[in-house]
Swiss-Prot record:
Pfam families: Cupin_1. This is Auxin-binding protein ABP19b. It comes from Prunus persica. One of its GO terms (biological process) is auxin-activated signaling pathway. PANTHER family: GERMIN-LIKE PROTEIN SUBFAMILY 3 MEMBER 3. The gene is ABP19B. InterPro entries: Cupin_1, Germin, Germin_Mn-BS, RmlC-like_jellyroll, RmlC_Cupin_sf. GO terms for cellular component: apoplast. It is found in: Secreted, Extracellular space, Apoplast; Secreted, Cell wall. Interacts with ABP20.
């Protein structure tokens, strides 16, 4: 029962782009630009362009964050190109976490379908909003705001995030700071973290300098 309610809610909230065409299926043979993919010629569009089956498979959570995201964005699901919507699957193993991150191009609605997830975001005035979510609960993350998810139980958790863009974008704060070649001294000055801790995080996440 929860899935019909969720998808009806999702479709009502989403905003599609007005167009003289019924759809703009992504043409992966053409370059991807700021406005998205070019449209495939309608004559070669098939029903398979509007169907994606990848979200029924659990993601691999054997990583440092014990988390996996399986996207159904325009890059994977050509039928959502130009429609202002997309979907993904989130798997969190016990102790799993999606660290603070932001989607510059979209708001997000997260539906929990298994387990317990602690989820929240931080507003631009630095006020935190967080809640422990159970099966059937949803939370919205406004566009561009930092947010996170943590498995709040001792069993695997599954959620389906939906987005108000076919290409929501992603920036993870930990990666932005520590998975690059930005000098440790600069990071220490701008974050007040100790240099040894910064070097440790760079080592874990693959950064240098």
């Amino acid at each position: 029962m929860i899935f019909p309610i969720f998808f009806t809610f999702f479709l009502l909230l989403s905003t599609s782009h007005a167009s003289v065409q019924d759809f703009c299926v992504a043409d992966y043979k053409a370059p991807d630009g700021p406005a998205g993919y070019s449209c495939k010629k309608p004559a070669i569009v098939t029903v398979n362009d509007f169907v994606y089956s990848g979200l029924g498979i659990a993601g691999n959570t054997t990583n440092i964050f014990k988390a996996a995201v399986t996207p159904a964005f325009a890059a994977q699901f050509p039928g959502v190109n130009g429609l202002g919507i997309s979907l993904a699957r989130l798997d969190l193993g016990p102790g799993g976490v999606v660290p603070f991150h932001t989607h510059p191009g979209a708001s997000e609605v997260l539906l929990v379908v298994q387990g317990t997830i602690i989820a929240g975001f931080v507003a631009s005035d630095n006020t935190p909003y967080l809640k422990t979510l159970k099966k059937g609960d949803i939370i919205v993350f406004p566009q561009g705001l930092l947010h996170f998810q943590v498995n709040g139980g001792d069993t695997p958790a599954i959620a389906f995030p939906s987005f108000s863009s076919p290409s929501p974008g992603l920036q993870i704060v930990d990666f932005a700071l520590f998975k690059n070649d930005l000098a440790t001294e600069l990071i220490a000055q701008t974050t007040l973290l100790d240099a040894p801790q910064i070097k440790k995080l760079k080592g874990v996440l693959g950064g240098t300098n």
